[in-house]
Amino acid sequence: MLWKACRKEFNKPKYLAHSSDLIYKYRNEIAEKARFRLVDKENGDPLRVVEHIGCHYSKMFPSKGVGGAEYPYVLAGMAEAWGGNVIDYPERRHCCGYGFRQYHVKANRGYSIANTHKKFESMEPYKPDMIITNCPGCPYFLDRWQYVIAEMEGKTYGQNGFGIPVLTYEELAGLVLGYDPWDLG
């Protein structure tokens, strides 16, 4: 198919790693240098973290992802090393709603928000303090649709009425290391 489209071939490299695999590899070193841990400053309890693995992380090359395609551990491993309590929830592997066919085709946008709605309904009983992702598109859609759902249905997820914070693993690593949130972007 690639050859038909652009006369190019994809030669799978011998070594293949997602950038989140690299942070995972150094998660313990980051924990040693951490200025902050993923704990509630009021009571010292671990923060409740739900993870969202981007659809393309382990589905494209199932044997390459940390933990495999069925139960990827790359984000959970980071959150646990940094003091968090990773919460499993029924729709953990469900799409965030971004899929190119779901969002970029205007007629499919209802499907996009329905995906995200299903995911939030699934995680809500577990009262997560944050969501961590490893895809640049997922946090955008998890944030965007969370607030659209609030406007449409008057329902806000999260304990404080402001929604559940959504962070990428890079942002979370930076915060744990003590970087200023405004400098992280």
What are these regions (language model features)?
Residues 1-185:
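Iron-sulfur cluster-binding electron-transfer modules in prokaryotic oxidoreductases
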